[in-house]
Amino acid sequence: MAKGKKKTSQKWKLYEVKGGKVVRKNKFCPRCGPGVFMANHKDRWSCGRCGYTEWKK
C-alpha cells in the first residue's frame, strides 16, 4: 500500500449557487436514485456505484 496523504473528496465541485439556490452540476443515476451522481466523461455518463452508463451522442 502506498504511503502518503489521502486524496480528499471534492464534492464541492458538484454544486453551484445561482440566485441564492443550490444547483447540481451532474446528473443523478436513474437506477440508484437521487444522491448518487453520475461521472461526466468525454463520451458517456457513468455511475460508479451500479455501473449504469449513458452514451453521449
From Swiss-Prot:
Keyword field: Metal-binding, Ribonucleoprotein, Ribosomal protein, Zinc, Zinc-finger
* One Pfam family, short name: Ribosomal_S27
Known partners and oligomeric status: Part of the 30S ribosomal subunit.
Q: Does the keyword Metal-binding apply?
A: yes
Q: Write out the residues that bind Zn(2+).
A: C29, C32, C47, C50
Q: Family, per the entry?
A: Belongs to the eukaryotic ribosomal protein eS31 family.
Organism of origin: Thermococcus kodakarensis (strain ATCC BAA-918 / JCM 12380 / KOD1)
- Requisite cofactors: Zn(2+)
The cofactor note from the UniProt entry for this protein is: Binds 1 zinc ion per subunit.
Instruction: Name the gene that codes for it.
Output: rps27ae
Name this protein carries in UniProt: Small ribosomal subunit protein eS31
